[in-house]
């Protein structure tokens, strides 16, 4: 796992001078963003899959359950490769998504999401 320094201060306020910093300087920004998106997609899909087995959710979510299960079974490298191919056509879209949501694309956010779901279930 990579260490991520958030653009938020310890008191929760955002510091515009700070940005996400890679602890692994050998990795280029594009590959890093792809991996970060994958990790968060995985955590969110895992959480959704967990919830679907515990409580009833609407038909819209059930419609996507097979895709979520397929994603969860996919090899990480294969999945990152597919994400790369998808975004290679429009790298600007990838960077727009990343910069718009970068403060939420942390592993802490996904873990908090999973934790909140577990609390609501039990």
Swiss-Prot record:
Record's keyword terms, sorted: Plastid
Domain of life according to the entry: Eukaryota
Localization annotation: Plastid
One of the record's GO cellular component terms: plastid
The protein's name: Uncharacterized 15.0 kDa protein in rpl12-rps7 intergenic region
Native source organism of the sequence: Euglena longa (Euglenophycean alga)
């Amino acid at each position: 796992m990579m260490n991520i320094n958030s653009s938020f201060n310890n008191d929760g306020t955002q510091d515009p001078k700070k940005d996400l910093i890679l602890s692994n300087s050998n990795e280029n920004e594009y590959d890093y963003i792809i991996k970060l998106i994958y990790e968060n997609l995985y955590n969110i899909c895992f959480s959704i899959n967990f919830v679907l087995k515990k409580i009833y959710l609407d038909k819209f979510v059930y419609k996507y359950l097979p895709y979520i299960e397929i994603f969860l079974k996919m090899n990480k490298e294969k999945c990152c490769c597919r994400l790369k191919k998808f975004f290679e056509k429009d790298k600007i879209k990838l960077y727009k998504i990343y910069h718009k949501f970068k403060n939420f694309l942390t592993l802490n956010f996904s873990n908090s999401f999973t934790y909140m779901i577990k609390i609501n279930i039990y």
